[in-house]
Amino acid sequence: MAKKAADVQKGGGFLIEDVTYDQMYTPEDFTDEHKMIAKTTEDYIEQDVLPHIDDIENHQFEHSVRLLKKAGELGLLGADVPEEYGGLGLDKISSALITEKFSRAGSFSLSYGAHVGIGSLPIVFFGSEEQKKKYLPGLASGEKIAAYALTEPGSGSDALGAKTTAVLNEAGTHYVLTGEKQWITNSAFADVFVVYAKVDGDKFSAFIVEKEFPGVSTGPEEKKMGIKGSSTRTLILDQAEVPKENLLGEIGKGHVIAFNILNIGRYKLAVGTIGASKRVIELSAAYANQRRQFKTPIAGFSLTQEKIGTMASRLYAMESSVYRTVGLFEDNMSQFTAEDLKDGRQIAKSIAEYAIECSLNKVFGSETLDYIVDEGVQIHGGYGFMQEYEVERAYRDSRINRIFEGTNEINRLIVPSTFLKKALKGELPLFEKAQSLQEELMMLMPEEPGSGVLEQEKYIVKQAKKIALFAAGLAAQKYGKAIDREQEILVNVADIVSNVYAMESAVLRTEKAIAAQGAEKAAQKVLYTEIFVQEAFNEIEAHAKESLIAMEEGDSLRMMLSALRKLTRVTPKNVIQKKREAAAGIFEAEKYTV
């Protein structure tokens, strides 16, 4: 249903607005069509991909190419490609579900993700009509495989520092590209590369480069810690001849494409961590049930229950946050006509509105998965260190996610800087909110949360938002334009905001479930929410305290810490018991349950 612009939540608006559960999309809102698409993908992964995972891990890439073509036949490569160019033109929820299900396929999910995401979407969103007609049907069918070439040996996070050059030849027919691109996923078998280079040495631009163009080659396979079943090579451009019409977008506007595609890559990465996390919990619960020590299944030990309870509660918050964000994309796009959305740039712009949420999801998702795989190995004990057990590969494969799509450090810094830009543009009244909060804090008498289900959690979310504004406002006031040099404080603020978004997402999802089916049927969700909110609030307090200590001293510090104590004063719940209760349902089902 179309929404008016006034009803669509602004990116970052969650920090200053009271959001209600009926404004949030949740996994419980999946339609029958969504579930059918998810089941189709799941069946394909189980029946076609998993039997060949070991071969793929050993670089038998002919399986990767064949399986991508099979995915194309099923329509799984064309979810984000409009129907007029051979795709399915599905909504973003469907696309996200396909990505989540693919993530069970280990390294192969990287081959899929690089193809349908960063490899194809630059053409979907920014390609000319001729480029779309030429390339998208083959990319949607799997006849052609795509790759994305941005990183260079000397430019990782600083993408605009690229050294690859593009010079128009004397005939004016071809750009001549010279340089090297590093760590290019799918490079062993990709047919089409989206490549960034500087026209005349200074105009950062994007090009569509085919592997058969003169001067295009790849180096040997990289030897990696994880994701061994994905192809990673250097793309070598030795005076590569690229037709003039293969310029993607405008000269000097490559950064617009790169940064928009990074936003998409970030949220898709977060979606992938959901499926990977579910798989590790599944493996860990099943192992804990069958592994006996001291004549008892280790699932019966409370420390194992603590691990599973924590893993699942973090996953619940992550899953809630990610699908909330995808729902925001849909809401934002619903205000446009079908004709408007034929312009892919409009879709990219709709997603870019939520750059903050994309970065938050990327960081929170990758670090949650890292925590889950680490504990998964621990539950497996020595067997978790052995390659014959799937959790060993999951542990190695997880680590790259904190580096992909902009390091987590860069993404953390993006959060406060984007908030600041929105405030300066008048898009979010952050300064006004922070100022009124500081005045309020000097007189604030601690409130008392209600005693009903989730009342304390809703109160904590409200207080956590105040803490975020308190810390951010104080930092902006103290450092002004020099705030970008205080990276530790900026990262603390980002972590506070990240926990706020995750907590609120979990609370709203559970509140929505209670409204739909009652508290008893939502009992597992309530447990996850209570556990996560309390532990995240403890982290928020620690981040805020560390920042205040760095910014203030003496009487001023004591006054600020006193204000913080007013905001964090709640009676803790018994999360040890709640984790035991949450784990019981997971061990019974031998999978993540809600």
Curated annotation (Swiss-Prot):
GO biological process: fatty acid beta-oxidation
Enzyme superclass (EC): oxidoreductase
Keywords per UniProt: FAD, Fatty acid metabolism, Flavoprotein, Lipid degradation, Lipid metabolism, Oxidoreductase
Active-site feature positions: E405
Gene3D superfamilies assigned to the protein according to its UniProt record, in alphabetical order: Acyl-CoA dehydrogenase/oxidase, N-terminal domain (1.10.540.10), Butyryl-CoA Dehydrogenase, subunit A, domain 2 (2.40.110.10), Butyryl-CoA Dehydrogenase, subunit A, domain 3 (1.20.140.10)
Pathway: Lipid metabolism; fatty acid beta-oxidation
A single GO molecular function term of this UniProt record: acyl-CoA dehydrogenase activity
Cofactor(s) needed by this chain: FAD
Enzyme Commission number, as recorded: 1.3.99.-
Highest taxon above the source species: Bacteria
Catalytic activity: a 2,3-saturated acyl-CoA + A = a 2,3-dehydroacyl-CoA + AH2
Function of the protein: Involved in the degradation of long-chain fatty acids.
Family: Belongs to the acyl-CoA dehydrogenase family.
Protein name: Probable acyl-CoA dehydrogenase
Source organism of the structure: Bacillus subtilis (strain 168)
Gene giving rise to this polypeptide: fadE
